[in-house]
From Swiss-Prot:
Upper lineage: Bacteria, Bacillati, Cyanobacteriota, Cyanophyceae, Oscillatoriophycideae
PANTHER family, alphabetized: DEVELOPMENTALLY REGULATED GTP-BINDING PROTEIN-RELATED, MITOCHONDRIAL RIBOSOME-ASSOCIATED GTPASE 2
Protein name (record): GTPase Obg
Assigned EC number: 3.6.5.-
Family assignment from sequence similarity: Belongs to the TRAFAC class OBG-HflX-like GTPase superfamily. OBG GTPase family.
Length: 354
């Protein structure tokens, strides 16, 4: 399936039904009286997070989403039926922006979480509403209000706890393949990976942790050079970064500094994320040189530094243990800081007529 992580769409909520002019004409009600009902609410457009969706591909083919209009009022003070809400499923991790203001208006993270992106119009008032002492037989009613129309931009930010970063050909895809059941395309040339790859790594407790191999980080990535600007946002939600450095590269220290510079330039919390530096390709490198690079890096960072080989799986157990330790520590300090969440009732999106 093609991986699409951004889309632009239009959403149109339903128009409220018109109120009507009607009068009672029963034989046993000689005085008659206004009896025109109100129009029903227009349907709203509601996004719902769905854990089984992994891409915004569907939004490349359907770009306009319209909810049902409300029905007009009926005689005998009958309110028209409300239009049916349009429920649109999106992947968990979808961020919703208003294209006209560039404002973030919604962020759907949890399965089943919903967000109303366009509210249906209120139904118009029937002539019964305008009955007064001065006007006993009003012959006018109000039309329903138009529903909201919005131009939206959708961005998918992957929900992975661990992000694997590094320059092209550092061995990121090989590492995620060695750690999980993911089978990304692997090759000995830059930009083999053109989309983020996800893999689930089992912990000793049996729980699964999602790892993401982020492609395309080169110098200037934060400005859109290479593929970086498209994919840097996918590590915004990660809790820890594994920074892979190729020991066989011409200048591993410079490569490390390049990626760190891109994280600093991009911002949005990425420089503050905990990091574990993994010096990769130890199987093809010089152990003394690896020790030298380790000491040089210790002058630049306080992050944990390990030497590994994704190909021979050397050092991977230690790497995983370091990752689990960081995640456990973060979980412990945030246990009492998690915000309360609640499930919104779809019916609560409509305000009752007063």
């Amino acid at each position: 399936m093609q991986f699409i992580d951004h889309a632009e769409i239009e959403v149109i909520a339903g128009k409220g039904g018109d109120g009507i002019v009607a009068f009672r004409r029963e034989k046993y009600v000689p005085a008659g009286g206004p009896a025109g009902g109100n129009g029903g609410w227009g349907g709203s457009v509601i996004f719902r997070a769905e854990e089984n969706l992994q891409t915004l591909l569907d939004f490349r083919y359907a770009r306009t989403f319209k909810a049902q209009d409300g029905e007009r009022g009926g005689p005998n003070n009958c309110t028209g039926a409300s239009g049916e809400d349009l429920i649109v499923d999106v992947p968990c991790g979808t961020v919703i922006y208003d294209r006209e203001t560039d404002e973030e208006i919604g962020d759907l993270v949890f399965h089943g979480q919903i967000f109303c992106v366009a509210k249906g119009g209120k139904g118009g008032l029937g002539n019964k509403h305008f009955l007064s002492n001065k006007n006993r037989a009003p012959e006018y009613a109000l039309p329903g209000l138009e529903g909201e129309i919005k131009q939206l931009r959708l961005e998918l930010k992957l929900l992975a706890e661990v992000g694997i970063i590094g320059l092209p050909n550092a061995g990121k895809s090989t590492l995620i393949s060695a750690l999980s059941a993911a089978r990304p395309k692997i090759g000995a040339y830059p930009f083999t990976t053109l989309i983020p790859n996800l893999g689930v790594v089992k912990r000793p407790t049996g729980d699964g942790t999602v790892f993401a191999d982020i492609p395309g980080l080169i110098e200037g990535a934060h400005q859109g050079v290479g593929l970086g600007h498209e994919f840097l946002r996918h590590i915004e939600r990660t809790k820890v970064l594994v920074h892979l450095v190729d020991l066989n590269a011409e200048d591993p220290i410079k490569n490390y500094e390049t990626i760190q510079g891109e994280l600093e330039a991009y911002g949005r919390g990425l420089p503050e994320l905990p990091q574990i530096i993994a010096l990769n390709k130890l199987d093809a490198g010089d152990h003394e040189f690896a020790d030298f690079i380790t000491e040089e890096l210790r002058r630049l960072t306080d992050a944990k530094i390990l030497t590994i080989s994704a190909v021979s799986r050397t050092g991977l157990e230690q790497l995983l243990q370091e990752i689990w330790d960081v995640l456990d520590y973060l979980k412990e300090i945030s246990r009492n800081e998690a915000p309360e969440t609640s499930v919104m009732d779809l019916e609560s999106l409509h305000i009752a007529d007063e």
